[in-house]
Amino acid sequence: KFKEKDVIIMGINTKKITNDTSKIFNSMVVLDNQLNLISEYNKIKLVPFGEFLPFEKFFNKIGLKKISYGYESFSSGYQRKLISIKNKNFNFIPLICYEIIYSGRINLNSDKTNFIINISEDGWFGNSIGPYQHFSHSKFRAIEEGKYVIRSANNGISAYISPKGKIIHELESTQKGVIEVKKFK
């Protein structure tokens, strides 16, 4: 059971339908304790061939529709935004998957930002060095931005990282568990 001030932050695919078009997004949503939508962020930097098919419209126009048959690309979000949770009095920058790897592109109202949340599905790396490399970028961004990073990775490394890149709490990819963040500065 959720408490009154609890919030749920999770990754989910969302669909927006306007007039005669529909778009699918890789999204992070924030829900209140009654599961009402507080805020959402749609991923901007999409993974080629994983989240979108490059040249999909071109292939369709020249008669190679079979290449993209049954495939519906994600749409890119429009802008990065700071998410504010008023009843918790905190603000965070949402980053989905590999958006965390881009240096120098996060700074968004830095003085108002308490931390960065990065959610990721690292299962596509398989049994490789990939999840560890991806996780390392979370530490780099914490240091670069001078912010705490909360990273939740399905089939990857989850962690709470200090602004100096120190791992406060970590769950390896094979571990099940919860990282509870009680406070931050």
Language model segments and positions:
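Enzyme catalytic cores with a strong preference for nitrogen-chemistry domains
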Residues: 1-185
